[in-house]
């Protein structure tokens, strides 16, 4: 589990693409501290398992499903990526619950600056937007952010300059694709609630006759 508080911005050192998967090697520093093979690191919000460690980087496998569902396939050498190690049991919970399982991809439709904040408007599919609520949490490329407004085709977030400086948001432009993970709590609530679809009536004339009516 992660919190959406980015520890550092790494860079893609190499990408080895296979027919149905890829191996990413990411140049990093902070997230290598105490990390062992088999540990989890979120790369742009996607939970990846460390398969190899080097003095200045780590390598991780990316499966076919992840490549299809996320924006990782668009990474190139030297691309900046947000990195976060899995939260330890005694760690501080600074953001919100982030599983590292991306729901899909959004696209930056607009970037606007005002006196104190930078606003990002993200367009996304309706399947993602159904879980996006105003004042709720959302993860954009591994960054825990608060939804400022929800629109029919997307949503907006307001970020402080510190967040932009400490993440790869400072290298994002209009038209860029970003990984999105909605709040997992909403998904569980939806799953537990009774379905709104009425159950099919199984009472038939033949059944009534068999029962003596």
Protein language model features and the residues they cover:
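Conserved loop->alpha-helix
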Residues: 1-213
């Amino acid at each position: 589990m992660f919190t959406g508080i980015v520890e550092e911005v790494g860079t893609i050192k190499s990408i080895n693409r296979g027919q149905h998967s890829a191996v990413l090697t990411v140049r990093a520093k902070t997230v290598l501290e105490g990390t062992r093979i088999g540990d989890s690191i979120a790369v742009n919000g996607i939970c990846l398992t460390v398969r190899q460690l080097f003095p200045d980087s780590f390598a991780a496998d990316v499966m076919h499903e992840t490549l299809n569902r996320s924006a990782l396939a668009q990474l190139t050498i030297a691309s900046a990526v947000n990195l976060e190690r899995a939260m330890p049991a005694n760690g501080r919970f600074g953001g919100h619950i982030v599983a590292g399982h991306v729901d899909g991809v959004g696209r930056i439709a607009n970037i606007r600056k005002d006196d104190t904040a930078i606003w990002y408007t993200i367009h996304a599919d309706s399947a993602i937007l159904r879980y996006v609520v105003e004042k709720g949490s959302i993860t954009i490329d591994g960054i825990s952010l608060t939804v400022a407004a929800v629109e029919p085709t997307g949503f907006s977030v307001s970020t402080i300059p510190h967040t932009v400086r400490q993440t790869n948001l400072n290298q994002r432009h209009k038209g860029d694709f970003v990984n999105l993970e909605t709040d997992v709590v909403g998904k569980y609530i939806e799953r537990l609630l009774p379905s709104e679809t009425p159950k099919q009536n199984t009472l038939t004339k033949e059944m009534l006759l068999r029962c003596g009516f």
